Regions:
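Gly/Ala-rich beta-loop-alpha elbow adjacent to hydrolase catalytic centers
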Residues: 115-119, 123
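Aromatic pocket-lining residues of Rossmann-like dinucleotide-binding sites
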Residues: 59, 126-127
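Accessory, usually C-terminal, subdomains that scaffold auxiliary metal cofactors
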Residues: 52, 73-90, 116
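Residue in the alpha/beta-hydrolase core beta-strand immediately N-terminal to the catalytic nucleophile
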Residues: 70, 110-112, 135-137
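N-terminal cap/lid segment of alpha/beta-hydrolase-fold proteins
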Residues: 1-36
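Hydrolase active-site cap/lid region
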Residues: 128-177
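Alpha/beta-hydrolase active-site loop
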Residues: 83-109, 125
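Short substrate-entry loop that stabilizes the transition state in hydrolases
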Residues: 30-35, 40-78
Length: 177
C-alpha cells in the first residue's frame, strides 16, 4: 500500500470564535462506508503531519477513519495563530466530537480518542468528561513529566540541577490529589 491511497480531506472544526485545522482520513477500502472513527490528538510540539504518519496511516490500513486536528497551543494553532495550550482539553474534544458527529461516514457509537505525547495526558482528562468517546488510547511517552523535563530545564532554562531534582515532587503531589 502506498501512503497516497488514503485520501485526506481538510476540515475546519468550529471552536468558539476560531476553527481548528484538521483532516479527515478515510479507512482504506471503506472510504464511502460508515466506519469507527479515531480522533487523534497530538502533543505539545506535535503537528497534524506528525500524527498523520505516526498514527492515521496505520489506522486507515486497519479499517478506521481518522480525524486529526491541531488544538489550541499545538501545531498551526500555536505557530500560525499564536493560541496558547489549555488544560481543559475536554472542552476542545467536545467541539471535535460535535464536529465528528456531523460527518456522514462516522459511526457515532464507535468514536475513539487517541492521545500521543502530551496528548496522552490530555486525552484521558478529555475522555472522562465526554460520554460519546467509546474507547481511549493514551500514549504519553513518559511515565513522569518531571523526568522528561529535568535535563531540559537545566540545559535551556538555567535551572540548577538541585532545583531540577525537585521536579519529581510535582508528580507526587499530582498523584495524591
Amino acid at each position: 500500500h502506498s501512503l497516497g491511497e488514503a485520501a485526506t480531506a481538510p476540515m475546519a472544526i468550529p471552536f468558539g470564535e476560531v476553527s481548528l485545522p484538521g483532516y479527515f482520513i478515510p479507512a482504506e477500502g471503506g472510504k464511502n462506508e460508515v466506519r469507527p472513527l479515531i480522533i487523534f490528538t497530538n502533543g505539545y510540539d506535535g503537528t497534524i503531519v506528525d500524527t498523520y504518519f505516526a498514527c492515521a496511516v496505520a489506522a486507515s490500513r486497519r479499517g478506521y477513519h481518522s480525524l486529526l486536528f491541531d488544538g489550541p497551543g499545538q501545531g498551526a494553532m500555536l505557530y500560525e495563530r499564536g493560541t496558547a495550550l489549555r488544560p481543559d482539553w475536554e472542552v476542545v474534544i467536545k467541539a471535535v466530537v460535535d464536529f465528528a458527529e456531523g460527518l456522514p461516514l462516522v459511526d457515532t457509537r464507535r468514536i475513539a480518542l487517541s492521545g500521543w505525547s502530551l496528548g496522552g495526558y490530555l486525552a484521558p482528562r478529555a475522555a472522562s468528561g465526554e460520554p460519546r468517546i467509546s474507547a481511549l488510547i493514551a500514549d504519553p511517552g513518559l511515565w513522569s513529566i518531571a523526568d522528561g523535563f529535568r535535563d531540559f530545564v537545566v540545559r535551556n532554562l538555567g535551572v540548577s540541577p538541585d532545583a531540577a531534582a525537585d521536579l519529581g515532587k510535582l508528580d507526587e503531589a499530582v498523584m495524591r490529589k
